[in-house]
Swiss-Prot record:
Gene3D superfamilies with a match to the protein in the record: 1.20.5.20, 6.10.140.380, Apolipoprotein
Classification of source organism: Eukaryota, Metazoa, Chordata, Craniata, Vertebrata
Protein name: Apolipoprotein A-I
Sequence repeats: 67-88, 89-110, 111-121, 122-143, 144-165, 166-187, 188-207, 208-229, 230-240, 241-264
Disulfide bonds listed in the record: none
Transmembrane segments: none
Record region (10 X approximate tandem repeats): 67-264
Function: Participates in the reverse transport of cholesterol from tissues to the liver for excretion by promoting cholesterol efflux from tissues and by acting as a cofactor for the lecithin cholesterol acyltransferase (LCAT). As part of the SPAP complex, activates spermatozoa motility.
The protein's assembly and partners: Homodimer. Interacts with APOA1BP and CLU. Component of a sperm activating protein complex (SPAP), consisting of APOA1, an immunoglobulin heavy chain, an immunoglobulin light chain and albumin. Interacts with NDRG1. Interacts with SCGB3A2. Interacts with NAXE and YJEFN3.
A GO molecular function held by the record: phospholipid binding
UniProt signal peptide: 1-18
Protein family: Belongs to the apolipoprotein A1/A4/E family.
The keyword Repeat appears for this protein: yes
Alphabetical GO biological process terms: adrenal gland development; amyloid-beta formation; blood vessel endothelial cell migration; cellular response to lipoprotein particle stimulus; cholesterol biosynthetic process; cholesterol efflux; cholesterol homeostasis; cholesterol import
């Protein structure tokens, strides 16, 4: 579990551009980040699982049972690795096709968002300016009170608190007025964006291209399923000896333990 947590922390703390920084590659697309996350997570689970198996085999019970779990784990890991290698090109093709087929929709939505952003930016700038003015006004009023505190020390602490409370409430109330005004100004654009999104989705639903995309997606999934069958069969064949060996070892250990109990 520690390895899984570490992998997730590294992935998120380094950010989506970590590969771009270290390898000087082009920034990753969202699809690439999803695929990299899946790879990191699977590798972390595999490594942490091997650590737990190793710890168990090193324990007194593990040595007594002598199940050779670590050897079986390595065999299983190699089999899974071969499966990933065989499915790699297939999954890459599926993600590439999906990204290509939905590119037009992302472009349309980005265009709508950019248009709304340009229209609401003046309101956001005005709100930020007014908020900064209120904060500066509050700071000017609080400054002399801080000097009073330093001069009067603890005996004036309660008095200072009483003076600060109405100032803080006044700042809160004035900020609320600006927020309400901003919300009122942005409401038409929010409704407009919601209507545009609904229109886009309705157009997609009624468009023949949706049926075409559905057919393409079904075709991609069918191709992925057909190409994955041989790899999954190889995985099953690779697991059978591991499971049989584990079954035999466990049964032998149970039988030996039963004999020892009967002999006592």
């Amino acid at each position: 579990m520690k390895a899984v947590v570490l992998a997730l922390a590294v992935l998120f703390l380094t950010g989506s551009q970590a590969r771009h920084f270290w390898q000087q590659d082009d920034p990753q697309s969202p699809w690439d980040r999803v695929k990299d996350f899946a790879t990191v997570y699977v590798d972390a689970v595999k490594d942490s699982g091997r650590d737990y198996v190793s710890q168990f085999e090193s324990s007194a019970l593990g040595k007594q049972l002598n199940l050779h779990l670590l050897d079986n784990w390595d065999t299983l890991s190699n089999t899974v690795g071969r499966l990933r290698e065989q499915l790699g090109p297939v999954t890459h093709e599926f993600w590439a096709n999906l990204e290509k087929d939905t590119e037009w929709l992302r472009q349309e939505m980005n265009k709508d968002l950019e248009e709304v952003k340009v229209k609401v930016q003046p309101y956001l700038d005005d709100f930020q300016k007014k908020w900064q003015e209120e904060v500066e006004r509050y700071r000017e009023k609080v400054g002399p009170l801080g000097a009073e505190l330093r001069e009067g020390a603890r005996q004036k602490l309660q008095e200072l608190h009483e003076k600060l409370t109405p100032l803080g409430e006044d700042l809160r109330d004035r900020a609320r007025v600006h927020v309400d005004a901003l919300r009122t100004q942005l409401a038409p654009y929010s409704d407009q964006m919601r209507e545009r999104l609904a229109t886009r989705l309705a157009a997609i639903r009624d468009s023949p291209s949706l049926a075409v995309y559905h057919a393409k997606a079904s075709e991609h999934l069918k191709t992925l399923s057909e190409k994955a069958k041989p790899a999954l069969e190889d995985l099953r064949q690779g697991l059978m000896p591991v499971l049989e060996n584990l079954k035999t070892t466990v049964l032998a250990a149970i039988d030996e333990a039963s004999k020892k109990l009967n002999a006592q």
